[in-house]
């Protein structure tokens, strides 16, 4: 059993830039080496690059409205209370819609495998849905 104090002790919140478009802030909750849990705040229009997780990823939307899209073409508009599961190694991206922020809790299984930046045309098409 492991009881976490609600965030990783001694690790500050950080602004993420290298694999995100727009302003994104992350607050580390738990890192066991196998499972990483973060609270992530996306400002309007901000989103991840394409990425995947060898053990899959669970997202729980806690504020605002967002988008989750996969390489297979699935696009979902999500809101508070929605839960998203991406299968192991499923390439996807997620972030806020253009008119609102989105906050989610991300439970990632295994090391994130980062890919290319999401094309602006792809983000715009998904956001319009």
Pin down the residues of each PLM region.
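A short, N-terminal "cap"/entry segment at the start of jelly-roll beta-barrel domains
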Residues: 1-35, 113-129
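Conserved short histidine dyad/triad with adjacent acidic residue
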Residues: 36-53, 88
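Short, conserved beta-strand element in jelly-roll/cupin
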Residues: 41-43, 52-68, 107-110
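A generic "binding-loop/recognition-motif" signal
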Residues: 46, 54-55, 74, 90, ...
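Short beta-strand His + acidic residue motifs that chelate non-heme Fe in jelly-roll/DSBH
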Residues: 48-50, 68-69, 86, 91-98
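Short acidic-glycine-tyrosine-enriched beta hairpin
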Residues: 72-88
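A short hydrophobic beta-strand segment most commonly corresponding to one strand
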Residues: 85, 99-117
């Amino acid at each position: 059993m492991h009881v976490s104090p609600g965030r990783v002790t001694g690790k500050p919140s950080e602004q993420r830039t290298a694999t995100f478009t727009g302003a994104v802030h992350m607050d580390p909750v738990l890192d066991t080496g196998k499972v990483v849990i973060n609270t992530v705040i996306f400002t309007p229009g901000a989103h991840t690059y394409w990425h995947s997780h060898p053990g899959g990823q669970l997202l729980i939307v806690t504020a605002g409205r967002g988008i989750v899209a996969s390489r297979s073409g699935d696009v979902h508009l999500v809101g508070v209370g929605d839960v998203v599961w991406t299968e192991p190694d499923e390439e996807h991206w997620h972030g806020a819609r253009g008119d609102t922020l989105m906050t989610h809790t991300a439970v990632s299984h295994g090391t994130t495998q980062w890919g290319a930046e999401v094309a602006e045309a792809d983000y715009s098409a998904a956001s319009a849905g």
